[in-house]
């Protein structure tokens, strides 16, 4: 049963349909035994073991295509925005991206734009896509637009390779997406 009544103050995490949708729920400490904090030989009752690797939070739900009540970045607005004229250009140390955001609604508003990147397949394990940058428009009047600029470095694209104890970026084609949430 889906229940979606919730007050969301900020947009920092996805809300699963049930807590059991989180892979770490199998490792939640409160599984019937309510021991004492700091008991010798037992994990602290507040301890949760995360075995999902790099796919924690929105990365997990997006990578395995599991539906959520509120996707990462979800938010409400009194107006509507359109995105167009996206440009992505490689730089010597990553890439620069820009997008035009236009208020197509009837009232003034601000839009939080998120930039997601999907890495090339192969090599190290990577989520389906990752948030790499975000920006917020100024207060846009109806019909007004603004161009937002994002700079993403090679370091932002890198993953830690334990076998060589170093940060590495995958070679190949990266896919860049803009949206107000991960589902846009």
Locate the predicted segments by residue.
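Secreted, periplasmic, or luminal enzymes acting at the cell surface/secretory milieu
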Residues: 1-5, 9-110, 116-118, 126, ...
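Secreted/periplasmic carbohydrate-active enzymes, especially glycoside hydrolases
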Residues: 159-171
